[in-house]
Amino acid sequence: MRLFPKSDKLEHVCYDIRGPVHKEALRLEEEGNKILKLNIGNPAPFGFEAPDEILVDVLRNLPSAQGYCDSKGLYSARKAIVQYYQSKGILGATVNDVYIGNGVSELITMAMQALLNDGDEVLVPMPDYPLWTAAVTLSGGKAVHYLCDEDANWFPTIDDIKAKVNAKTKAIVIINPNNPTGAVYSKELLQEIVEIARQNNLIIFADEIYDKILYDGAVHHHIAALAPDLLTVTLNGLSKAYRVAGFRQGWMILNGPKHNAKGYIEGLDMLASMRLCANVPMQHAIQTALGGYQSINEFILPGGRLLEQRNKAYDLITQIPGITCVKPMGAMYMFPKIDVKKFNIHSDEKMVLDLLRQEKVLLVHGKGFNWHSPDHFRIVTLPYVNQLEEAITKLARFLSDYRQ
């Protein structure tokens, strides 16, 4: 009998946010168990509704949105994206420099496939959003992880970045605000990273999907505005700030000089054409979202759900003996550290599996974000306060006598 194994290209590709632990949670649900899910940044299931004006505009445009559009996206949506970034000081891009995709996830994969040859290297943060590492690997490249320092508010370690640049390095990825740590980078830090890219002729990929989800007066700086002389690729979308993850609307905008990237851009154009276009009806949400009332502010200011849930989750998690955590300044996650000696932990995946089976709470282990040690896990802070209290109380109870 002929067997059809998994492609060798996927041998070192992983995405543990929806990996084996998630599959076990689905199995438990099928058996009738209720699972408290703190594993994925999907706002809608937790009562975060899309702004009404976005839904209205999508519905109004449905009759004219039944066919394909330009492979890069609707002109009106791309124009709105360009104007938004112009207002942020990013001036070196036109409508033709914007690609709209079925979520940022599709565009990350496209961006890597168009750029990398076998053996090319991309600097990726550790910890990272794992799709970046997966996309680099799937494209034949090598993800080289630079350290983000927990003792320095999870900021990237500049010396480690410098040490890992070599002749094979083509690009550096910056995730700011950061997933999974919630760090928001200072302007001075970003300028140091820009200088490394400048000295080594690197493309900068800026994953800024959480740029509007900021706490305690934190300020987000667009790295493309700090590097007008470099090719920067900024990625963002509607999933988080506008609470429409299911619309699958993301964009990628190229800023800076492009004369030395004509081949790369041809590759992006080819890949965009091969998938014809992104979901057309939902592209009508982009112009309304970027130009309308920014309702996300209601959630991040004092009294807002996201801020209050961040505060409650942080207060509860840091009361558990053996757990420490850097307070996140942005996004919708925490990345606590667990004392592996106290709990004799050798496998963080086993720990979250044991928690799931015993307490029916679903988390993602740190190695799922390419962290190098089994001493972290990620908590999503989207659930209501009472749900967070229940989940973290169960975590504390689980850890009270847990030993591997």
From Swiss-Prot:
SUPFAM superfamilies: PLP-dependent transferases. Transmembrane segments: none annotated. CDD domains: AAT_like. Coiled coil: none annotated. InterPro entries: Ala_Aminotransferase, Aminotransferase_I/II_large, PyrdxlP-dep_Trfase, PyrdxlP-dep_Trfase_major, PyrdxlP-dep_Trfase_small. It comes from the Bacteria. It catalyses: L-alanine + 2-oxoglutarate = pyruvate + L-glutamate. L-alanine binds at G41, N179, R378. The modification N6-(pyridoxal phosphate)lysine is found at K240. Gene3D superfamilies: Aspartate Aminotransferase, domain 1 (3.90.1150.10), Type I PLP-dependent aspartate aminotransferase-like (Major domain) (3.40.640.10). GO terms for molecular function: L-alanine:2-oxoglutarate aminotransferase activity; pyridoxal phosphate binding. It is an enzyme of class 2 (transferase). Pathway: Amino-acid biosynthesis; L-alanine biosynthesis. Its EC number is 2.6.1.2. Its cofactor is pyridoxal 5'-phosphate. Keywords: Amino-acid biosynthesis, Aminotransferase, Pyridoxal phosphate, Transferase. One of its GO terms (biological process) is D-alanine biosynthetic process. Belongs to the class-I pyridoxal-phosphate-dependent aminotransferase family. Involved in the biosynthesis of alanine. Catalyzes the transamination of pyruvate by glutamate, leading to the formation of L-alanine and 2-oxoglutarate. Is also able to catalyze the reverse reaction. Homodimer. This is Glutamate-pyruvate aminotransferase AlaA.
